[in-house]
Amino acid sequence: IIVVNKPAGMVVHPAAGHDSGTLVNALLFHVDDLSGIGGEKRPGIVHRLDRGTSGLMVVAKHDAAHQELARQFHDREVEKEYLALVWGEVVAGRRIEDAIGRDPNNRLRMSNRARRSREAVTRIVRVYHVNPALSLAQIAIHTGRTHQIRVHLSSIGHPIVGDALYGGVRRRVRGDIRPVLKLQRPFLHAARLAFKHPVDGRRMEYESELPRDLKSVLDELITRSRPEDLEQTEP
């Protein structure tokens, strides 16, 4: 297996309009062989992250490893946690169970109102209130639907900051939000990934710190906040 820390802006595998510069292109340059189960355009790819999302991914080098990792994802044995800066004061401990499918009115979007949809479960583990307008949320997903966190947070009125597709652009709010205006992508980072090694069953756990672009925004927000605004909450 290979665990990578994908940068924001990088597409995972070749697709229309993205024949080069993808994660798969980079992997093939550095690795002699990858699992072939995903096909010619997706060698080794067991799961994906959106182009604008940074963070941890596990890649399979061999077919047997791919099959076992795919089973763990299917059986919801893989632990996946993200950090997201969201609008408003979101509540820690909230569980969102809302099926997701392709938006029939916009093929670029997913929706919780689609006719054809699949089960999706998201849990807000911990929340750090940055100021009255913004919260940093630690989020666990128990399923892996396309745009799942982005759709679910938007559906409860707390879209991810910087996510223009799901309503996370600039808002009229209380509190100093000037630092977020420099964001060029959704404030969403895959920060933790845990699974069993596909060969020997050892527990493997990886963590990734916020990348520079997100950390600089968060640090500036905290610097500008009043002490009474900063609060961490758990269920």
What do these predicted ranges mean?
Residues I124:
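Long C-terminal interaction/binding lobes of large macromolecular proteins
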Residues R115, P132, H142, H152-P235:
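Pseudouridine synthases involved in rRNA/tRNA modification
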Residues I1-R109, F187, E207-P235:
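RNA pseudouridine synthases
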Residues P104-L108, E119-V121, R172-R178:
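Short Pro/Gly-enriched beta-strand edge/turn motifs at strand-loop
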Residues R48-L49, E89, V127-H129, D163:
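Residue-level recognition of beta-strand microenvironments
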Residues W87, Q138-H142:
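A structural micro-motif recognizing beta-strand termini
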Residues I2, A133-A137, A191:
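Short beta-strand micro-motifs in enzyme catalytic cores
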Residues L69, R145-L153:
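Short beta-strand segments enriched for Tyr within beta-sheet-rich domains
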